[in-house]
Amino acid sequence: MSEQITSAKATAKTVRTSPRKARLVIDLIRGKSVADAISILKFTPNKSAGIIEKVLMSAVANAENNFDLDVESLVVSEAFVNEGPTMKRFRPRAKGSASPINKRTSHITVVVTEK
């Protein structure tokens, strides 16, 4: 007997946004319905909100096209941000010295489930 799949997942890897800032936005949508989550993200004035919205729309598209789930009844069951690789750069400073700059990246994952 085959089990009915009720969830779909989407991941964006090595996204050029800080995990700490992305977590603030992802906490807003966890547990919400997809329609609510999209409206929250549209009106959140944050760079990572646009990226998270794309990942959410990708998860919804995966649910619809790959698993034939009903889009109206989808809920954001899991949403988390992990730390990606850090790009290390140097900023020139006075007297020939340099300061390190860490350009952080994130791995963003969103899982949607049918109610």
UniProtKB/Swiss-Prot annotation:
PROSITE patterns: RIBOSOMAL_L22
Disulfide bonds: none
Full protein name: Large ribosomal subunit protein uL22
Function: This protein binds specifically to 23S rRNA; its binding is stimulated by other ribosomal proteins, e.g. L4, L17, and L20. It is important during the early stages of 50S assembly. It makes multiple contacts with different domains of the 23S rRNA in the assembled 50S subunit and ribosome. The globular domain of the protein is located near the polypeptide exit tunnel on the outside of the subunit, while an extended beta-hairpin is found that lines the wall of the exit tunnel in the center of the 70S ribosome.
GO cellular component: cytosolic large ribosomal subunit
Keywords: Ribonucleoprotein, Ribosomal protein, RNA-binding, rRNA-binding
Pfam families, per the entry: Ribosomal_L22
Record's keyword annotation contains Disulfide bond: no
HAMAP family the UniProt entry points to: Ribosomal_uL22_B
Gene: rplV
